[in-house]
From Swiss-Prot:
This is CD2-associated protein. Keywords: Cell cycle, Cell division, Cell junction, Cell projection, Coiled coil, Cytoplasm, Cytoskeleton, Host-virus interaction, Isopeptide bond, Mitosis, Phosphoprotein, Repeat, SH3 domain, SH3-binding, Ubl conjugation. The modification Phosphoserine is found at residues 67, 80, 86, 224, 458, 463, 469, 510, 514, 582. The gene is CD2AP. Pfam families: SH3_1, SH3_9. The modification Phosphothreonine is found at residue 565.
C-alpha cells in the first residue's frame, strides 16, 4: 500500500468520499477502476478522494524516520545489518563501515536555502519570504515550488526566489559558490543514494568531498554528479537575467535566522490596483467614468459578467471594462510574480472548481523592468478597444439618459393651422381657395366662366368681407346679401390637361376658415340645416338681379352654385372624395378578382387536360390488358 499527502482541501460531496485537508496523510491508498479517484484510509475511515488533490509520498522521505534503525547499527546486531542492506542495498565494494553511514546520515539530514528576493504569499499555505531568511527544505512539491519550514511555519514557496545552501559534515551551511561561466539551472529533487554526495544547489559547480575506500576509487574527482535535474528551456531563459542580481545580493557566508514577522502579518494580502489605459465614460449608473492614467482600486474581478471588473475611484464604487485598464500591485509594482500551474485535470469536471488554493507563478524583477522599458518606448498609443457587451439597459434608464442629454423624440405632426380669411385687394381680387375644390366637375367651372361679369359693387363686397371676418363667434346665414359672381384672374388662362381650377364660392365668405370657425362647425351645420328654404328663397328671388345673365335658368343655376356656403361646399367635396376613393377601391378589387378568376380558369383548364390525358392512357392500358388476356385464353384453350 502507498501513502499520500494532501496538497489541497477537498470537502466530500457523497457519503463514500473523504473530507481532506492540506498536510494530512492518507494511508493504505489504492487505485480504483474509475479514472481520477483513489481510495484510502484517514482517521479510521476509508473512502474515496480525487487523485489531483494529493501527492504520493516517495520512499526517499522515509529516510528521515529511519533514525532509530541507524542508531542501532552502533550495537552491531544482525537485525540492523539486515535492515540496512534491505533499505540501501548491497554496495558493489562490500559492506560500508560505520563512519561512512554517519556521513550519509548527516548529508541526508537537511537541505536549506537562502532567500534572495522578497515574496508576498498569495494563498494561505504559502510562506512570506524576506531577503536573507534561511528556510529548511522538506521536499519538492512540484516543478518550481518547494515545501519548507520558516520560523516554525510549514508552507510552500517558489524555488526561483531562493538559493540552496551547501551542508557540510559539521552541520554548517554555506552558500554554493557561483562560477562566472555557469548558468543557473532549475531546482532538483533530493534523492539520496549510497556512495553519492548530496546535490548541489541550482546546478552550480562546487568542490565536493572525495570519496575513498569503498571500492569505487577516485571517480568523482572532477566534480559532483547531478541527479534528475529537470530544467526546462523556459525556466533557464527566465533565470538568465537573474545572475547579476544574485551576485550583488550575496551576503556573508552564514546569517542568523531573523524572526521578526508574525504569522498574521504573513497572511495580509496586498491591495490590487489598476491603471487606466484609455478614457471611458460610464453609460449606466453603476459604471465608473475615468480618464487615462488614473489609478482604480480593484475590488473584485467577479462581477457576474465577463469582461467587467468592480473597483473604486474617488470614493465611488462601480464596474468598468477590464480591457481599458492594466492591473498593478500596490506593494510591489515593479514586477508581476510567477503563477503556479494548477494540478493535473484528471478528476471529473466539477472537481477542479473545489480547489481552495491555486498557486501563482510570478516572474522576476528584471523581466518586469525590461517590460516596463519596452512599454515606455512605444511610439504611439493604440486605439481604444471596443467596450465589451453588457446587460441590456432597462427602458427607464434609457429614457432618463435621453432626457438628461437633451435628446427629444419627434412628436406626431399636428394638423396645420389654416391661414386667416383672405382680404379683398385693391382691384377686388380674392386669393385662390383650397385645393379641395379641385374635385368639382369641370362642366360647372365652364358654366361659371361663361357667365362671369365685371364686379360692379366692389365697395359692398369689401364691406361684407370685413364684416364676416369680424363675426367669427356667431354666423347667421340670413344676413348674407347676394352679389354678382366673381371671376378669378386665372380662369381664362390656358389649362393643363387633367387639371381644374378651384370652384366658385360666395364673395362674402372665404373657403379657408380660422381655427375658431373650424371649432364651431357643428353650430354652423345646425344653422344651415335649420333654414335651407330661406336661403334658397333669398338666393332665387334676390332684389338685385344680374344684368349680365343671358337667361333666367342659367341665372338661377349660377346663383345656386354661387351661394353655396363653405360648409356645404366642404361637405360636398368630402363626399365626392369618399365616393371617388371608394370607387377606385372597388375598381381595384374588381380588377384583382378578374385576375384571380383568369388564373383559376387557366389552372382548371390545365387540370382538365391532364385528366383527359390520364384517362386516355388508362383506356389504352386497359385495351392492351384485355388483348393480353384474350391471347392467354386462346393459348390455354389450344394447349
Amino acid at each position: 500500500m502507498v501513502d499520500y499527502i494532501v496538497e489541497y482541501d477537498y470537502d466530500a460531496v457523497h457519503d463514500d468520499e473523504l473530507t481532506i485537508r492540506v498536510g494530512e496523510i492518507i494511508r493504505n491508498v489504492k487505485k480504483l477502476q474509475e479514472e481520477g479517484w483513489l481510495e484510502g484510509e484517514l482517521n479510521g475511515r476509508r473512502g474515496m478522494f480525487p487523485d489531483n488533490f494529493v501527492k504520493e509520498i516517495k520512499r526517499e522521505t522515509e529516510f528521515k524516520d529511519d533514525s532509530l534503525p541507524i542508531k542501532r547499527e552502533r550495537h552491531g546486531n544482525v537485525a540492523s545489518l539486515v535492515q540496512r542492506i534491505s533499505t540501501y542495498g548491497l554496495p558493489a565494494g562490500g559492506i560500508q563501515p560505520h563512519p561512512q553511514t554517519k556521513n550519509i546520515k548527516k548529508k541526508t539530514k537537511k537541505r536549506q536555502c537562502k532567500v534572495l528576493f522578497e515574496y508576498i504569499p498569495q494563498n494561505e499555505d504559502e510562506l512570506e519570504l524576506k531577503v536573507g531568511d534561511i528556510i529548511d527544505i522538506n521536499e519538492e512539491v512540484e516543478e518550481g515550488w518547494w515545501s519548507g519550514t520558516l520560523n516554525n511555519k510549514l508552507g510552500l514557496f517558489p524555488s526561483n526566489f531562493v538559493k540552496e545552501l551547501e551542508v557540510t559534515d559539521d552541520g554548517e551551511t554555506h552558500e554554493a559558490q557561483d562560477d562566472s561561466e555557469t548558468v543557473l539551472a532549475g531546482p532538483t529533487s533530493p534523492i539520496p543514494s549510497l556512495g553519492n554526495v548530496s546535490e548541489t544547489a541550482s546546478g552550480s559547480v562546487t568542490q565536493p568531498k572525495k570519496i575513498r575506500g569503498i571500492g569505487f576509487g577516485d571517480i568523482f574527482k572532477e566534480g559532483s554528479v547531478k541527479l534528475r535535474t529537470r530544467t526546462s528551456s523556459s525556466e533557464t531563459e527566465e533565470k538568465k537575467p537573474e545572475k547579476p542580481l544574485i551576485l550583488q545580493s550575496l551576503g556573508p557566508k552564514t546569517q542568523s535566522v531573523e524572526i521578526t514577522k508574525t504569522d498574521t502579518e504573513g497572511k495580509i494580502k496586498a491591495k490590487e490596483y489598476c491603471r487606466t489605459l484609455f478614457a471611458y465614460e460610464g453609460t449606466n449608473e453603476d459604471e465608473l467614468t475615468f480618464k487615462e492614467g488614473e489609478i482604480i482600486h480593484l475590488i473584485s474581478k467577479e462581477t457576474g459578467e465577463a469582461g467587467w471588473w468592480r473597483g473604486e475611484l474617488n470614493g465611488k464604487e462601480g464596474v468598468f471594462p477590464d480591457n481599458f485598464a492594466v492591473q498593478i500591485n500596490e506593494l510591489d509594482k515593479d514586477f508581476p510574480k510567477p503563477k503556479k500551474p494548477p494540478p493535473p485535470a484528471k478528476a471529473p469536471a466539477p472537481k477542479p472548481e473545489l480547489i481552495a488554493a491555486e498557486k501563482k507563478y510570478f516572474s522576476l524583477k528584471p523581466e518586469e523592468k525590461d517590460e516596463k522599458s519596452t512599454l515606455e518606448q512605444k511610439p504611439s498609443k493604440p486605439a481604444a478597444p471596443q467596450v465589451p457587451p453588457k446587460k441590456p439597459t432597462p427602458p427607464t434608464k434609457a429614457s432618463n439618459l435621453l432626457r438628461s442629454s437633451g435628446t427629444v423624440y419627434p412628436k406626431r405632426p399636428e394638423k396645420p393651422v389654416p391661414p386667416p380669411p383672405p382680404i379683398a385687394k385693391i382691384n377686388g381680387e380674392v386669393s385662390s381657395i383650397s385645393s379641395k375644390f379641385e374635385t368639382e366637375p369641370v362642366s360647372k367651372l365652364k358654366l361659371d366662366s361663361e357667365q362671369l361679369p365685371l364686379r360692379p359693387k366692389s365697395v359692398d363686397f369689401d364691406s361684407l368681407t370685413v364684416r364676416t371676418s369680424k363675426e367669427t363667434d356667431v354666423v347667421n346665414f340670413d344676413d348674407i346679401a347676394s352679389s354678382e359672381n366673381l371671376l378669378h384672374l386665372t380662369a381664362n388662362r390656358p389649362k393643363m390637361p387633367g387639371r381644374r381650377l378651384p370652384g366658385r364660392f360666395n364673395g362674402g365668405h372665404s373657403p379657408t376658415h380660422s381655427p375658431e370657425k373650424i371649432l364651431k362647425l357643428p353650430k354652423e351645420e345646425d344653422s344651415a340645416n335649420l333654414k335651407p328654404s330661406e336661403l334658397k328663397k333669398d338666393t332665387c328671388y334676390s332684389p338685385k338681379p344680374s344684368v349680365y345673365l343671358s337667361t333666367p335658368s342659367s341665372a338661377s343655376k349660377a346663383n345656386t352654385t354661387a351661394f353655396l356656403t363653405p360648409l356645404e361646399i366642404k361637405a360636398k367635396v368630402e363626399t365626392d372624395d369618399v365616393k371617388k376613393n371608394s370607387l377606385d377601391e372597388l375598381r381595384a378589387q374588381i380588377i384583382e378578382l378578374l385576375c384571380i378568376v383568369e388564373a383559376l380558369k387557366k389552372d382548371h383548364g390545365k387540370e382538365l387536360e391532364k385528366l383527359r390525358k390520364d384517362l386516355e392512357e388508362e383506356k389504352t392500358m386497359r385495351s392492351n390488358l384485355e388483348m393480353e388476356i384474350e391471347k392467354l385464353k386462346k393459348a390455354v384453350l389450344s394447349s
